[in-house]
Structure formats: structure tokens, C-alpha cells
């Protein structure tokens, strides 16, 4: 079986090519999905990549969540499809109600573009099963609205249910409880602000630590 990973492109998406390259790097077929498509083209998993979908008008991810392709993604999630939202994709997943909380302006109100260290907290997701708990990853962060916020009840629930997937070592954007990524209750949907697709080889990125997410998704698809 050849796993097919769909990568969505919205107007304003920047990192779809990188996400598709990461999928191919682990041996999957990368399938392009346009925002106006009402068909997931038979893919086994979906990546909602980073950028500025629809120019981030109204609010980051607010318009993208209403697109035909996201209607299909929401339906597919109900059937257990693995979905990864990266940066703006994380914002889209929160706006679509697939993940709790929201992403707001960074502390200091500056755009941040630098490599950061993350710690893997949960390996019980479709996107992190290849990692050992407490593994440290070096990946890129580039966002102006990357500060994760949620109510204390939601934060307690995420911690209590093991749904915090990544935490920052150096919390430079002010995310509550150092949260860099979270998952759905069943671990099939993961959202994260840093960019694993930019860390798939040391020649072009800070490390190859991001490959583990895409290999994990491959394992999940092939095991199902």
C-alpha cells in the first residue's frame, strides 16, 4: 500500500510545497488539495500547512475554516483520518473546532522567525508515535500570531488527558503552559505552531527532527 498524504493550498498558503516534499521524503505520495475542492481525492491523511490563508482577514484561519475543502476535512476527522495543522494550519483547526483554544498575537507583538527547541510530551498520537517521550526537537518557528491560549479548564483538560503534544524549551511567544502543540482526544488530529516540514534534512533546515512526524503518520496509515 502506498500512503497518500493530502496537502491543502489556500490563497495565501506559503508552506504547501515544503509539506508535500516532507511527505515524499518519507515515501508517501503527496496529493495537492485546492481550497475550493469538495473532494479529498482518496487521501489517507491531510496536512493543513502554514502561511496566511485568505490573507488572514477577519482573523487567522477564520475564513479558511469555511472553505469546501475544510468541510471535507471535518467530515474525514469524524472517520478517524489523521490531520496535521502547522502554524496557520493549527489556527485553521482551532477555528474549525477540531482543536480547542486559539492562537493570538505573540507577547511583544513581534513576528518571530527563528529555530526553537521543542520537547515531545505525547507519543500517543498519529503524528508522534515514532518519537520517545521527552525527545528534544530542533525546528523552525515563524509566526506573528503563535501564542496558544485557552481557558484554565481547557488547559487542565489537555494536561490531564495527555493531549499536550509539544512544549517549548524557551517560550518566546508567550503560549500558556509553554504549549507548542496539542492533539484531539483520540490523537488523530494534531496542531502545532513550529514547522516540522522545514526540518527534514540538515542541508536545508536546522535538523532532520521533523521527519518523525511524517514517518509516524505513515505508520498510522499503513497500520489501519
Swiss-Prot record:
Pfam families: GATase_5. GO terms for cellular component: cytoplasm. It catalyses: N(2)-formyl-N(1)-(5-phospho-beta-D-ribosyl)glycinamide + L-glutamine + ATP + H2O = 2-formamido-N(1)-(5-O-phospho-beta-D-ribosyl)acetamidine + L-glutamate + ADP + phosphate + H(+); L-glutamine + H2O = L-glutamate + NH4(+). InterPro entries: Class_I_gatase-like, PRibForGlyAmidine_synth_PurQ. It is found in: Cytoplasm. Signal peptide: none annotated. GO terms for biological process: 'de novo' IMP biosynthetic process. This is Phosphoribosylformylglycinamidine synthase subunit PurQ. The lineage of its organism: Bacteria, Bacillati, Actinomycetota, Actinomycetes, Mycobacteriales.
Amino acid at each position: 500500500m502506498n500512503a497518500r498524504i493530502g496537502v491543502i493550498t489556500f490563497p495565501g498558503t506559503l508552506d504547501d510545497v515544503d509539506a508535500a516534499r516532507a511527505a515524499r521524503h518519507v515515501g508517501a505520495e503527496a496529493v495537492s488539495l485546492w481550497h475550493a475542492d469538495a473532494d479529498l481525492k482518496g487521501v489517507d491523511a491531510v496536512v493543513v500547512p502554514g502561511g496566511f490563508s485568505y490573507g488572514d482577514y477577519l482573523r487567522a484561519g477564520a475564513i479558511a475554516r469555511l472553505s469546501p475543502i475544510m468541510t471535507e476535512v471535518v467530515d474525514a476527522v469524524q472517520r478517524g483520518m489523521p490531520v496535521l495543522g502547522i502554524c496557520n494550519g493549527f489556527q485553521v483547526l482551532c477555528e474549525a473546532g477540531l482543536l480547542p483554544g486559539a492562537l493570538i498575537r505573540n507577547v511583544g507583538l513581534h513576528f518571530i522567525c527563528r529555530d526553537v527547541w521543542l520537547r515531545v510530551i505525547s507519543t500517543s498520537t498519529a503524528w508522534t508515535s515514532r518519537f520517545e517521550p521527552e525527545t528534544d526537537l530542533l525546528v523552525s518557528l515563524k509566526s506573528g500570531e503563535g501564542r496558544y491560549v485557552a481557558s484554565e479548564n481547557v488547559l487542565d483538560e489537555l494536561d490531564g488527558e495527555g493531549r499536550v503534544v509539544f512544549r517549548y524549551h524557551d517560550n518566546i511567544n508567550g503560549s500558556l503552559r509553554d504549549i507548542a502543540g496539542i492533539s484531539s482526544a483520540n490523537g488523530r488530529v494534531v496542531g502545532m505552531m513550529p514547522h516540522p516540514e522545514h526540518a527534514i534534512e540538515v542541508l536545508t533546515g536546522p535538523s532532520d527532527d521533523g521527519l518523525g512526524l511524517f514517518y509516524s503518520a505513515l505508520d498510522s496509515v499503513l497500520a489501519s
